[in-house]
């Protein structure tokens, strides 16, 4: 029968003839182990990928709890709970991140490839600021640490107003125990007699000592005076001290109000000394501030003077057009060089400055005439117009001075007569010698000009005197000249008009002949100066 059954089974279904055998455990282990690539996102940035192998606990597939258990083994317990996990899966034509929980099944991204991503979790209470849980854990650890004395001094300042009488000490200590953290509360509330404290921890008794000063009597350092300092020294500053012992052998007996008063009085001497030191250190030294202000004013004045001196300390070379800073006080040698160069030296507040006179292109000259210097002509026109003896002075006589007038001012009272020298240049002597014959021939035909020559010779002596002396003798000279030379008011106006017109039109004196005078001079510095001026002839 058995042989027939075997033959029948082989003919009917060959698969039924196979014996069912269970697979070996090694085969099951190979199937349960899966390779996973995961990313960690910190500060919103993905790190480099990590690789690990996870055993599948369920025949349905890989669950997230299997991955979390493997991470706790590899990276430490609690590491996986700090992240939210998501898996990469195909969606339509691309890939998406599928958020997962612990009981969710992880789908492979491609075949047997699993890709996971862990993102940092954010706290719900601080979701607006996006603070991660890792930072919250460190903040909780910092809260356990003892608060600094600066933060506690703010709490004590609010309750220091209740220290006016003896009852306020118990009330203040009770408030501090409520405001202080548990670590400090256990230390401060534990009662120990002051004698035992001094015996055990005399060195560590005043380690955490701090003081709270009342704001009364204190003033700003900038508004302190001698009166306020003396008044504040009479009224003592009320202080409150708190001592925190660092010994670990402190017993847990309750501290009474009397013990508080004794413990506060133990450090009163030190507090008073420190209060006096702090009181004295508030007021700044007034002498230093005054001296510093004086130094600032000195520097400002020196800067202003330096700017003013720079404005008037430039020498102008007419040939090369180069500006060079000159010495503010000229010596005798420098003054001679100025006279040689036919320049005008104007004296203002004992500071010398060179004013160009023979080039009208400079705008700072008061009177841009090629024949007269501004410092001489503008001051002497009034005197010439008032004195009839000087009204007949020829313009060609004044052209030889060419701005070489030196006006000096002396501040000393002894030197009352500060004479100004009016020198004629070398060109005048040469022209006078050449024209001496022509003047002698025309002397008979023109008696008016011969009369005016002595007055022109006296011009240098009259103008060389000091200005107040000329103003005082102005009437006397006018009376003497009117006796010698009669002149009416009409002629006076006509003469003044002739002088003003001659200043505006210097070419209208001589229309017949003109001559060119050239002066070549070399200064000590090596610069060569050439002066060319057109001079009309002496004939009218």
UniProtKB/Swiss-Prot annotation:
Membrane topology: Peripheral membrane protein
Region (DIX-like oligomerization domain): 32-123
Keywords: Cell cycle, Cell division, Cell membrane, Developmental protein, Membrane
Residue stretches of biased makeup (Low complexity): 150-163, 185-194, 280-292
Comp. bias (Basic and acidic residues): 471-482
UniProt feature, compositional bias: Polar residues: 221-244, 418-437
Pfam families attached to this UniProt entry: SOK
GO biological process: cell division; plant organ morphogenesis; protein polymerization; regulation of cell division; regulation of root morphogenesis; specification of plant organ axis polarity
Biased composition (Acidic residues): 246-256
GO molecular-function term, one example from the UniProt record: protein homodimerization activity
Tissue-level expression: Expressed during embryogenesis and in roots.
Location(s), subcellular: Cell membrane
Intervals of motif Association to cell membranes: 342-343
Gene Ontology CC annotation, any one: basal plasma membrane
Origin: domain of life: Eukaryota
Note: 'Soseki' means cornerstone in Japanese.
Its job: SOSEKI proteins (SOK1-5) locally interpret global polarity cues and can influence cell division orientation to coordinate cell polarization relative to body axes, probably by guiding ANGUSTIFOLIA (AN) polarized localization.
Subunit structure: Homodimer. Forms long polymer filaments with other SOKs proteins polymers (e.g. SOK1, SOK2, SOK3 and SOK4) crucial for polar localization and biological activity. Binds to ANGUSTIFOLIA (AN).
Domain notes: The DIX-like oligomerization domain is required for polymerization, edge localization and biological activity.
Protein name in the entry: Protein SOSEKI 3
Organism: Arabidopsis thaliana
């Amino acid at each position: 029968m058995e042989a027939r059954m075997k033959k029948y089974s082989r003919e009917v279904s060959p698969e039924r003839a196979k014996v069912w055998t269970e697979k070996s455990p090694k085969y099951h282990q190979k199937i349960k182990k899966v390779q996973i690539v995961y990313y960690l996102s910190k500060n919103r940035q993905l790190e480099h990928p990590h690789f690990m192998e996870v055993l599948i606990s369920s025949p349905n597939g890989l669950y997230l709890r299997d991955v979390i258990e493997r991470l706790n083994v590899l990276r430490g317990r609690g590491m996986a709970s700090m992240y939210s996990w998501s898996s990469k899966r195909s969606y339509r034509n691309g890939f998406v991140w599928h958020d997962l929980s612990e009981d969710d099944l992880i789908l492979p991204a491609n075949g047997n490839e699993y890709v996971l991503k862990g993102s940092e979790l954010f706290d719900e209470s601080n979701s607006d600021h996006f603070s991660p849980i890792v930072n919250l854990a460190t903040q909780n650890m910092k809260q356990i640490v003892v608060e600094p004395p600066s933060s506690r001094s703010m709490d004590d300042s609010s309750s220091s107003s209740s220290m006016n009488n003896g009852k306020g000490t118990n009330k203040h200590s009770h408030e501090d125990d409520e405001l202080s953290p548990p670590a400090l509360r256990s230390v401060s509330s534990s009662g120990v007699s002051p004698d035992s404290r001094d015996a055990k921890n005399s060195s560590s008794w005043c380690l955490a000592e701090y003081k709270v000063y009342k704001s009364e009597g204190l003033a700003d350092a900038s508004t302190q005076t001698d009166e306020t300092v003396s008044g504040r020294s009479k009224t003592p500053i009320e202080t409150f001290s708190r001592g925190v012992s660092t010994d670990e052998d402190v017993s847990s007996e309750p501290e009474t109000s009397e013990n508080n008063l004794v413990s506060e009085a133990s450090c009163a001497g030190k507090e008073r000394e420190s209060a006096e030191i702090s009181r004295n250190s508030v007021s700044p030294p007034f002498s230093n501030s005054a001296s510093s202000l004086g130094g600032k004013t000195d520097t400002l004045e020196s800067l202003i003077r330096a700017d003013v001196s720079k404005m008037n300390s430039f020498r102008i070379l007419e040939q090369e057009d180069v500006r060079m800073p000159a010495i503010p006080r000229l010596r005798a040698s420098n003054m001679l060089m100025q006279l040689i160069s036919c320049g005008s030296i104007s004296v203002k507040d004992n500071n010398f400055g060179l004013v160009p006179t023979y080039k009208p292109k400079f705008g700072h000259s008061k009177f841009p005439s090629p024949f007269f210097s501004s410092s001489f002509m503008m001051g002497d026109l009034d005197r010439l117009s008032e004195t009839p003896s000087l009204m007949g002075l020829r313009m060609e006589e004044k052209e030889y001075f060419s701005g070489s007038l030196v006006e000096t001012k002396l501040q000393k009272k002894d030197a009352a007569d500060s004479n100004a020298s009016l020198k004629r240049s070398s060109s005048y002597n040469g022209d006078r010698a050449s024209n001496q014959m022509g003047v002698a021939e025309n002397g008979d035909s023109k008696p008016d000009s011969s009369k005016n020559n002595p007055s022109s010779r006296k011009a240098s002596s009259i103008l060389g005197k000091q200005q107040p002396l000329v103003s005082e003798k102005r009437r006397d000279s006018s009376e003497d000249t009117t006796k010698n030379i009669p002149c009416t008011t009409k002629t006076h106006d006509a003469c003044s008009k002739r002088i003003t017109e001659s200043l505006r039109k210097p070419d209208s004196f001589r229309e017949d002949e003109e001559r060119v005078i050239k002066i070549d001079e070399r200064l000590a510095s090596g610069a060569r100066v050439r002066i060319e001026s057109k001079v009309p002839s002496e004939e009218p």
